[in-house]
């Protein structure tokens, strides 16, 4: 619905006046003696779509939970809208989160699920109905409002989960691997919808995934993580064409980039790359 889309877009444009960035400074997190995040520094421009990408156990979901206020930090600060929210409760951070498991209440219908957060915040009935109408039309779930989650497809459930976040008009959207439970065809469709959503609303998004295709197609920026450290934070094009280190070069792409060990030498104003490939006798026999 074009009018619903324009209405929501206007709301988010008004919200973004004066909004700066999400800024993370020198952030560290330990679980006991295990260091999960190490001196993370990250700044996200308003309206950007940042994807946190990395292998399992790299710390990306922990970082997202810290932004949401679901995890405490050992060192550093988190700023939203120029305010230090490091010790602010999740409900007071003006963020909305979409989970991998949808996290819909099975006993509630779509309408009740979408407006639950607004009712908890004691928003007026008129405002609730206004937001519900706009968002449900925008996400094309307005015909599903009386259905229970068990009566919806995976894609419909994901749209409802996104709608529940949208009605709150948050400063920042946090997505925690929202498409990983969907089949391949539906993942492609939902990627397209999330991309369209961001292009129309221009909201600030932090999105966690281990799927490179998702990251490259959705993000305006990608922060690649490994062992609790951001290896590179750049545009998808630069991540792919100009990796900052061998981990990024080997991690991105299928097949990954070929890496050859060698030495750079300068002599007589010329630079040469010298390498020596050594083979075992078995490998040499195979080559013959």
Question: What is each residue range found by the language model?
Answer:
Residues 76-84:
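Conserved ABC transporter NBD signature motif
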Residues 244-281, 288:
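ATPase nucleotide-binding modules
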Residues 92-96, 100-247, 251:
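ABC ATPase nucleotide-binding domains
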Residues 68:
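Helix-to-loop junction immediately C-terminal to a conserved catalytic motif
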Residues 1-15, 279-288:
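Single conserved hydrophobic/aromatic residue that forms the stacking wall/gate
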Residues 74-77, 127, 227, 261:
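Conserved coupling/switch loops of ABC nucleotide-binding domains, chiefly the family-specific signature
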Residues 53-55:
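The feature captures the beta-strand-to-loop junction immediately N-terminal to the Walker
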């Amino acid at each position: 619905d074009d009018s619903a889309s324009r209405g929501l877009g206007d709301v988010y444009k008004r919200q973004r006046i004066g909004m700066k960035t999400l800024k993370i400074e020198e952030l560290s997190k330990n679980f006991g003696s295990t260091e999960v995040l190490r001196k993370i520094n990250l700044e996200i421009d308003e309206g950007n779509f940042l994807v946190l990408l990395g292998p399992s156990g790299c710390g990306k979901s922990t970082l997202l939970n810290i932004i949401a206020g679901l995890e405490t930090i050992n060192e550093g600060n988190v700023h939203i809208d120029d305010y230090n929210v490091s010790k602010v409760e999740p409900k007071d951070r003006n963020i909305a989160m979409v989970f991998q498991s949808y996290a819909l209440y099975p006993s509630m219908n779509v309408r009740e699920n979408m407006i639950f957060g607004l009712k908890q915040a004691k928003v007026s009935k008129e405002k609730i109905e206004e937001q519900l109408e706009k968002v449900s039309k925008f996400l094309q779930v307005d015909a599903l409002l009386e259905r229970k989650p068990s009566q919806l497809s995976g894609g419909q459930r994901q749209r409802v989960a996104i709608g529940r976040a949208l009605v709150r008009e948050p400063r920042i959207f946090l997505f925690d691997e929202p498409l990983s439970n969907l089949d391949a065809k539906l993942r492609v469709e939902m990627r397209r919808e999330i991309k369209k959503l961001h292009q129309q609303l221009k909201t600030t998004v932090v999105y966690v995934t281990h799927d490179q295709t998702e990251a490259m197609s959705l993000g305006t920026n990608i922060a690649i993580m490994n062992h609790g450290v951001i290896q590179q934070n750049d545009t998808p094009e630069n991540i792919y064409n100009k990796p900052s280190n061998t981990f990024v070069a080997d991690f991105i792409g299928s097949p990954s980039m070929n890496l050859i060990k060698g030495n750079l030498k300068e002599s007589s104003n010329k630079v040469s790359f010298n390498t020596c490939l050594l083979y075992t006798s078995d490998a040499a026999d195979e080559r013959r």
